[in-house]
Amino acid sequence: QMNKITRPPVGGWQQPIRALYEVKVPGRKLKSFIDPQHDVTTEDVRLAHREGFVSVEHLKRYTTLGMATDQGKMGNIIGLALMAEALGKEISEVGTTTFRPPYTPVSIGALRGRSVGRHFRPLRRTPLHEWNLDHAGTMTEAGLWQRPWYFARDGETLADAYVREAETTRRTVGLCDVTSLGKIAVQGPDATDFLNRVYSNAFAKLAIGKARYGIMLRDDGLVMDDGTSWRLSETEYFMTTTTAHAAPVMAWLEELLQTRWSDLKVHVTSVSEQWAGIAVAGPCSRTVLEACVEDPACVNNGNFPFMGVIETVLKNHIPCHIARISFSGELAYEVYVPSDYGPAAMDLLWGVSEPMGGCLYGLEALGAMRIEKGHVTGAELDGRVTIEDAGLGRMASTKKSYIGSVLRKRPELTREAAPRLVGIFP
């Protein structure tokens, strides 16, 4: 089947990511530093073992590992892993050294510098940042990210540019950088049960190779976030969140697994940095994908239905995941490739789209098209909105219990006179 997801084994759900403490090159002796403050190398740790220093405290004093200002926060775990390997033990059996204050890092800003300006928090750029700038993109802040606001032509104003982008997308095809969306890997035998408890709508019967749009509520019954989750296998999902709520949603999922449902066999891992995302939207979007993938049949209407998910390869040998998802009302797809391949994938898609009369579009046009469709935007999800306010009350399940399922039924949150989000036809 074209839409069947296949992947190599990764060691079971309990070891989705293997630990790597040292990069070794056969036939070469590398000098690898593990404590840059005191110039401690991997060979220093092995020398300590050969000299008979088997205690971690002896290792620390022989090599000065972890005796600098960071008190081992940077390199100790690697040193302990190498010592454990030399002793033939587990890291937990080797033990740790005694840490001295500060036990946790102290921000330099807490000691000096009261005016921080734009340095108050980091500014994140997508793998397509330079590509967008090279194609006349005007950037704006979205959460912590820099994203294209609009792509002006020949001195266009913001209003001129976003109207043209929206009209072109609805008429032919448009490409949009959506890398900033939060991306979370949900893995484990109980992953389906976990998502079914977190989302207000049903996920228990979601088939492999399909995606579903979900609404996540807080305990008080108000909307926390929305996004899609793709089922990649029996035990693995790929969840997307809004840009602004990526970190809060990740923290919320971790809290639920650690404090409420610690019996569930589930791991959640942020993979936002690992994938570059490109939305391909418009009546000609399928034609663009057919010209860009190695097997055009995998994206035809019969093999790739609405909310379907496939794993395929682009013509420039780039592996990718594609979901048939639309947030603008048109036929649309989301294409995710490994981050380093983002510019190359965009070059390929744009090389096909531009001759067809397609365009690049930014957040302003995306917001306009979402409003026309009646789909919630970031402005609506401000922590004071109910699922009924968002016009999505019918999605909420009446057959299961989920986070916020009780308090969302409070009279004040379900009154008929409350404002409702509706679509505006273009």
Predicted feature residues:
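Catalytic cores of large soluble enzymes that bind and process phosphate-bearing ligands
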Residues: 33-40, 48-51, 67-75, 116, ...
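Conserved, structured C-terminal
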Residues: 125-129, 133-134, 147, 233-235, ...
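Cofactor-binding beta-sheet edge motifs in enzyme active sites
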Residues: 22-40, 46, 68, 145-148, ...
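Acidic, proline/glycine-enriched N-terminal capping motif
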Residues: 78, 85-217, 222-224
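Residues forming the flavin
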Residues: 1-123
